[in-house]
Amino acid sequence: MCRHLGWLGAQVAVSSLVLDPPQGLRVQSYAPRRQKHGLMNADGWGVGFFDGAIPRRWRSPAPLWGDTSFHSVAPALRSHCILAAVRSATVGMPIEVSATPPFTDGHWLLAHNGVVDRAVLPAGPAAESVCDSAILAATIFAHGLDALGDTIVKVGAADPNARLNILAANGSRLIATTWGDTLSILRRADGVVLASEPYDDDSGWGDVPDRHLVEVTQKGVTLTALDRAKGPR
């Protein structure tokens, strides 16, 4: 489980999204307000951002609230596309840098908020870690992000107890799924935020319904039901 956040829009400082808000990921690492599973997210953190078309990452298995080095540098890290997460490790999963989101295939950054039975996922050398989220990320990368909705539906059918909230970015797109946990959206004048929970009390935040796929591009926001019978919205 984790709390994650994505940004697509104008160039902004990483700190303005992750550290500065009154209920940003720094605070969510020890006092989340809407987390359904787990009490805090102290098993690591990661920030990914795009330098042109190149994804860059800074990850740590330590709690975000105590990382003074990151706090001092984050105001200088700026990007138009950012993906960040704080982690609450699934019981039995390793606490290490390689198990900490965001994961990458060299083009996309990806975070998973939830849990999945590794037995329903194909094992392969592409996974960054043996943890469930890393193996799920490798599976999603192998099928392609354009097929994210189909992949989540299939994995969810194979493991009915899975929680499969995904957030991914490639520099020009944000894609997210809701499958068992919360996701909120904020449309700002300078861009769009997708987040596990609001980072402040702005009245513009809205909730994304469960079992939906959200895509954010420069053209706008698209919301599609993962239940085929509901169709696009």
Swiss-Prot record:
It catalyses: gamma-L-glutamyl-hercynylcysteine S-oxide + H2O = S-(hercyn-2-yl)-L-cysteine S-oxide + L-glutamate. It comes from Mycobacterium tuberculosis (strain ATCC 25618 / H37Rv). The keyword Lipid metabolism does not apply. Pathway: Amino-acid biosynthesis; ergothioneine biosynthesis. Its EC number is 3.5.1.118. Pfam families: GATase_4. It is an enzyme of class 3 (hydrolase). The active site is at C2. GO terms for molecular function: hydrolase activity, acting on carbon-nitrogen (but not peptide) bonds, in linear amides. CDD domains: YafJ. This is Gamma-glutamyl-hercynylcysteine sulfoxide hydrolase. The lineage of its organism: Bacteria, Bacillati, Actinomycetota, Actinomycetes, Mycobacteriales. The gene is egtC. One of its GO terms (cellular component) is plasma membrane. GO terms for biological process: ergothioneine biosynthesis from histidine via gamma-glutamyl-hercynylcysteine sulfoxide.
